[in-house]
């Protein structure tokens, strides 16, 4: 088997990846995610996940309607906990060991609090670590949370799954003339204001020389596995 150049990756999933038009958490979508996880593990690559909560709640949207932004962000972070528990449950049913870690303390044995040492130990043991609650603080996106967790666990790269197959000059869903980048520098992505990730996430990854790959897993669940095998898919952002 061709060995991947990556030993440990962090996969950033949106909450929408777990939903369909009828269900905020769709069993079929969950199983697709678990199959992707298993394909990564089969290549002897360790994987951690940061999951969003937009399928359940978006604090920023309700803030525009008058809700206190801090309250909305706290509610959004709680939504990510529900998504993380759902992924972990289906993983366990498929004999994939997991460890769920939250950015803020949750009692009652629901999940562990973030501890980068314990997270790395779990990854070394072959477990999938699922991070939730973003950074644990309001006013930060889950993209920034993904960058932070990737740095904490010494990941080789952040893989962000999106609706499109990379980073484009403009939104390809709205503009059919948009062109896809094969690769970008962090400075270029920030200067061009390409809003596939927020500036804080790009800046953190740039500072720590942490590669980002933006790709789509909507049409082909093998895309991440293919990238790990060296196929030139998606858009790579690096120094």
From Swiss-Prot:
Nucleotide-binding as UniProt keyword: yes
Molecular function terms from GO: ATP binding; UMP kinase activity
Record keyword Cytoplasm present: yes
Broadest EC class assigned to this enzyme: transferase
Keywords: ATP-binding, Cytoplasm, Kinase, Nucleotide-binding, Pyrimidine biosynthesis, Transferase
Domain of life: Bacteria
GO biological process, one term: 'de novo' CTP biosynthetic process
Pfam families, A to Z: AA_kinase (PF00696)
Pathway: Pyrimidine metabolism; CTP biosynthesis via de novo pathway; UDP from UMP (UMPK route): step 1/1
SUPFAM superfamilies linked to this entry: Carbamate kinase-like
Activity modulation comment: Inhibited by UTP.
Binding positions for ATP per the UniProt entry: 12-15, 54, 58, 162, 168, 171
Cysteines paired by S-S bonds: none
UniProt: UMP binding residues: 53, 73, 135-142
Catalytic activity annotation: UMP + ATP = UDP + ADP
Listed EC numbers: 2.7.4.22
Entries under Gene3D superfamilies matching the protein: Acetylglutamate kinase-like (3.40.1160.10)
Function: Catalyzes the reversible phosphorylation of UMP to UDP.
Subunit details: Homohexamer.
Similarity-based family: Belongs to the UMP kinase family.
Name of the protein in question: Uridylate kinase
Gene symbol of the encoding locus: pyrH
